[in-house]
Design a protein with these regions (language model features):
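Conserved ABC transporter NBD signature motif
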Residues: 64-72
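Short coil-to-helix segment of the ABC ATPase nucleotide-binding domain corresponding to the Q-loop/switch region
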Residues: 101-109
């Protein structure tokens, strides 16, 4: 425990993951604390998605250890991992909605199929409705994913990721393939989720604009919108940026330090700020 005595929600200790002869992650170590936001930048193939899947226990490290909520995931069986995963929301890069299910059924899926959730049957629909209202999709219960726009499908996937009210949420490139206005809407929802529910947030992205919004905006519950706030002003914990290159964590720190870096690899992300 550190960072002003906040509890570490997620910890990587010298984690290495290999696929064949390729090291997808190489000796990665970091801690994410309660209520902290972490923005993970890196080029395609740098290990960002592998890091999230390792945090979820979907990928086992070849060496090193991963801890979530103080428990060692590396030593767990698949059955034991189910309980941990019920505390982690995950938005996969492709959204991964079930095309044959309605939006209501998609969002309800974690409540009905994660054994550790214990949601009473009479509470499932209200929880689904609440999650969809939260992402401003209240009128889509009976629609199918194919009837929604790309941005709306992404918002429905966010609703499914947070319907169980997890304390840790992992987002894998939530704005990929979206136009700038829709991308801004998605990040605004992530900020809303973070600040209203006080979640720990890990955001993987190639877009520095996304990280800049996460770091410098907060949700105003009275106004019902996000508003500018200096990095760290929204609460005691500032946003931490991480940069991966070829599976290695080459940067971990605050936004000012990131923007002051002279590393050309890092600089190319910072130039995307506007």
């Amino acid at each position: 425990m550190s960072q002003d005595n906040h509890q570490a929600v997620l910890r990587f200790d010298r984690v290495t993951v290999t696929f064949g002869d390729v090291e997808a992650l190489s000796g990665v170590s970091f801690e994410a604390f309660e209520g902290e936001s972490r923005v993970i930048l890196g080029a395609a193939g740098s290990g960002k998605t592998v890091l999230l899947k390792t945090a979820l226990g979907l990928v086992k490290p070849d060496s090193g250890e991963v801890y979530a909520f103080g428990e060692n995931l590396t030593a767990m069986s698949e059955r034991q991992l189910f309980d941990i995963r019920s505390k982690i929301g995950m938005l996969f890069q492709e959204g991964a909605l079930f095309d044959s299910l309605t939006i209501q059924e998609n969002v309800a899926y974690p409540l009905l199929n994660q054994r550790s959730i214990h949601c009473p049957p009479e509470r499932v629909l209200p929880r689904v409705e609440e999650a969809l209202e939260f992402v401003e999709l209240g009128g889509t219960l009976e629609k199918f994913p194919s009837e929604l726009s790309g941005g709306m499908r992404r918002r429905a996937a966010i609703a499914r990721a947070v319907v169980t009210e997890p304390p840790l949420v992992l987002y894998d490139s939530p704005t990929a393939g979206l136009d700038p206005i829709t991308a801004h809407t998605i990040i605004a929802l992530l900020i809303k989720e973070r600040d209203v529910k006080q979640t720990t947030t890990l955001l993987v992205t190639q877009r520095y604009q996304d990280g800049n919004l996460i770091a410098n905006f907060r949700y105003n519950s009275k106004q019902g919108c996000i508003e500018p706030a200096r990095n760290g002003a929204r609460r005691t914990m500032p946003t931490t940026f991480m940069v991966l290159r070829d599976g290695r964590l080459i940067f971990e720190g605050g936004q000012d330090e990131l923007e002051g870096s002279h590393d050309p690899y890092i600089s190319k992300f910072v130039k995307q700020r506007v």
